Swiss-Prot record:
Component of the cleavage factor Im (CFIm) complex that functions as an activator of the pre-mRNA 3'-end cleavage and polyadenylation processing required for the maturation of pre-mRNA into functional mRNAs. CFIm contributes to the recruitment of multiprotein complexes on specific sequences on the pre-mRNA 3'-end, so called cleavage and polyadenylation signals (pA signals). Most pre-mRNAs contain multiple pA signals, resulting in alternative cleavage and polyadenylation (APA) producing mRNAs with variable 3'-end formation. A motif (Nudix box) lies at residues 110-131. GO terms for cellular component: cytoplasm; mRNA cleavage factor complex; nucleus; paraspeckles. InterPro entries: Cleav_polyA_spec_factor_su5, NUDIX_hydrolase-like_dom_sf, NUDIX_hydrolase_dom. Gene3D superfamilies: Nucleoside Triphosphate Pyrophosphohydrolase. Pfam families: NUDIX_2. The record marks E56, R64 as: Interaction with RNA. One of its GO terms (biological process) is positive regulation of pro-B cell differentiation. It is found in: Nucleus; Cytoplasm. It comes from Danio rerio (Zebrafish). It comes from the Eukaryota. This is Cleavage and polyadenylation specificity factor subunit 5. Keywords: Cytoplasm, Differentiation, mRNA processing, Nucleus, RNA-binding. Belongs to the Nudix hydrolase family. CPSF5 subfamily.
Length: 228
């Protein structure tokens, strides 16, 4: 049985090298939260209305990457944020997704403006996409970042890490858990449907929902859900 000397790190490579180099370790380290409790409410608690269609900025995938290329030359890496809204049906968590057509699903969110704060930007985007039309301000509660994805090139593939040898990713996407109030009214653009997809349907289902949405069951497994 080998024993690691007390003054020697047991992590990193080569042996004894800490990959963070104590860069992120301070004396005033925050206490670790071992369990995070999130309240979920039934889907039937929420009312869904409609509003005018909300169209994408780009008419095609090729046009989207061309605009991304042009903007990258001017302002650098694109920053996008998306919100994960969860309800429950029969004590099973469901994620609210926007459906366009018959096979395309997305999380609500979008591009941040240059210099825009991530949380404030996501609140703005959530209001634009799902905000009610009667002037009542929606209260979006955003406390937890649950995932980071990077696009290394001007192409569809995205990864939950920056691939080796990539020094200038073209897009950084952050996923945030948006905690819903007990009751709320959402206005959905007419060209979309808002669907509630159970976690068991998303799990390991990249062909149906893409790699990001299908990874949500793993990302959400760290939370302790309370079914109200």
């Amino acid at each position: 049985m080998s024993v690691v000397p007390p003054n020697r790190s047991s992590t990193g490579w080569p042996r004894g090298v800490n990959q963070f180099g104590n860069k992120y370790i301070t004396q005033a380290t925050k206490p670790l939260t071992l369990e995070r409790t999130i309240n979920l409410y039934p889907l039937t608690n929420y009312t869904f209305g409609t509003k005018e269609p909300l169209y994408e900025k780009d008419s095609s995938v090729a046009a989207r990457f061309q605009r991304m290329r042009e903007e990258f030359e001017k302002i650098g890496m694109r920053r996008t944020v998306e919100g994960v809204l969860i309800v429950h049906e029969h004590r099973l968590p469901h994620v609210l997704l926007l459906q366009l057509g018959t096979t395309f699903f997305k999380l609500p969110g979008g591009e941040l403006n240059p210099g825009e704060d991530e949380v404030e930007g996501l609140k703005r985007l959530m209001t634009e996409i799902l905000g009610r039309q009667d002037g009542v301000k929606q209260d979006w509660v955003i406390d937890d970042c649950i995932g980071n994805w990077w696009r290394p090139n001007f192409e569809p593939p995205q990864y939950p890490y920056i691939p080796a040898h990539i020094t200038k990713p073209k897009e950084h996407k952050k996923l945030f858990l948006v905690q819903l109030q007990e009751k709320a009214l959402f206005a959905v653009p007419k060209n979309y449907k808002l669907v509630a997809a159970p976690l068991f349907e998303l799990y390991d289902n990249a062909p149906g929902y893409g790699p990001i949405i299908s990874s949500l069951p793993q990302l959400l497994s760290r939370f302790n859900f309370i079914y109200n």
